[in-house]
From Swiss-Prot:
One Pfam family per UniProt: PGK
Protein name: Phosphoglycerate kinase
Molecular-function GO terms, alphabetical: ADP binding; ATP binding; phosphoglycerate kinase activity
Phylogenetic classification of the source organism: Bacteria, Pseudomonadati, Pseudomonadota, Gammaproteobacteria, Pseudomonadales
Annotated localization: Cytoplasm
């Protein structure tokens, strides 16, 4: 994958527009989770160190396009950046017809989704973005799967279009895990439905040596193997699909599970052998014996890809399976990459972020890359690099 990299460019005195993913949860005007902003900071600092006039843009939430809405304003992000960078970061609402930014200064543009034509990737808007800068830097892996004005269109028209350090690191890490992984490779794919992760499962079945499934996905695989899953969430219409995937790759199944009679924070958890699951049981986690077996598998792996908690870890009594596997990944010498919102929440909960080789900032983009799909915002950077 050949793209121009911001790190290789001379940016002194250049006007540089950086597309970041600053789409963070905001409540009462305060940033609730700053992971994405923190991930972007090294890129912004580097651009300033290189002597650029820095303009930063992002979306936040899903406002009605073309209309300002206070709840989707990037004002709380501008305030956060001001503190983090130790300098005033002005938030500019009116920027499409040109702005004055001096070398060594940094400004944040208001939510790109307030601009008509952003989501449709309209040429007219993309050309306006491109006219603002000498260099466009795409650094938002989390939105790379969307061809929009500020992720794709601007890269078509800008004088120079490059990948930022964060995007480049994502592509390198995913390439290392998927293109030529050190073996054996294990993948953990968990979630409520096989249908939403079918392409991921099929893609990984052709790459990895062990495919560990969890959540509702595991229940469908259990049903496919002839086990009773009680009133657990599973997809009867995808049992044959699960059988076909299990014929292509080793899918170790739980030998014991944690069940409850209801899905609730106060639900009583009971450990049962898989053969003992009753008709009114809901499987909400893998059992301790299964967790130990899966942890052993992970210990011998050289590459681990993790997407999704294996149980309802938000409720502590159904979180032991996820905690055990999270710690096994953290303790492993393997190259480990983790992605997806729930996965990041589990990593936070169990305090293992420092011990995962690479944590992807992208949710949908992470999954689409794993599926083998082309990410439009990356593809255009490759095309521009060819000249």
């Amino acid at each position: 994958m050949t793209v121009l990299k911001m790190t290789d460019l001379d940016l002194k005195g250049k006007r540089v527009l950086i597309r970041e993913d600053l789409n963070v949860p905001v409540k009462d005007g305060q940033v609730q989770s700053d992971a994405r902003i923190k991930a972007a900071l090294p890129t912004l600092k580097l651009a300033l160190e290189k002597g650029a006039a820095v303009m930063v843009c992002s979306h936040l939430g899903r406002p009605t396009e073309g209309e300002f809405s206070a709840e989707n304003s990037l004002k709380p992000v501008a305030e956060y950046l001001s503190k983090a960078l130790g300098r005033e970061v002005p938030l500019l609402a009116d920027y499409l017809d040109g702005v004055e930014v001096k070398a060594g200064d940094l400004v944040l543009f208001e939510n790109v989704r307030f601009n008509k034509g952003e989501k449709k990737n309209a040429d007219e808007l993309a050309q306006k973005y491109a006219a603002l800068c000498d260099v466009f830097v795409m650094d938002a892996f989390g939105t790379a799967h969307r061809a929009e004005g500020s992720t794709h269109g601007v890269a078509r028209f800008a004088k120079v279009a490059a990948a930022g350090p964060l995007l480049a690191a994502e592509l390198d890490a995913l390439g290392k895990a998927l293109d030529n992984p050190a073996r054996p490779m294990a993948a953990i794919v968990a979630g409520s439905k096989v249908s939403t992760k079918l392409d991921v499962l099929n893609s990984l079945a052709g790459i990895c040596d062990q495919l560990i499934v969890g959540g509702g996905i595991a229940n469908t695989f259990l049903a496919a193997a002839g086990h009773k899953v009680g009133k657990s969430l599973y997809e009867a219409d995808l049992v044959e699909t699960a059988k076909a995937i299990a014929a292509k790759v080793k899918v170790p199944l739980p030998v014991d599970v944690v069940v409850a009679k209801e899905f609730a924070e106060s639900a009583v958890a009971t450990v049962k052998a898989i053969a003992e699951v009753a008709d009114d049981d809901m499987i909400l986690d893998i059992g301790p014996q299964t967790a130990a077996q899966f942890a052993e598998l992970l210990k011998t792996s050289k590459t681990i890809l993790w997407n999704g908690p294996v149980g309802v870890f938000e409720f502590d009594q159904f979180g032991e399976g996820t905690r055990t596997l999270a710690n096994a990944i953290a303790d492993s010498a393997a190259f480990s990459i983790a992605g997806g919102g729930d996965t990041l929440a589990a990593i936070d909960k169990y305090g293992i972020a420092e011990r995962i080789s690479y944590i992807s900032t992208g949710g949908g983009a992470f999954l689409e890359f794993v599926e083998g799909k082309v990410l439009p915002a990356v593809e255009i950077l490759e095309q521009r690099a060819k000249g």
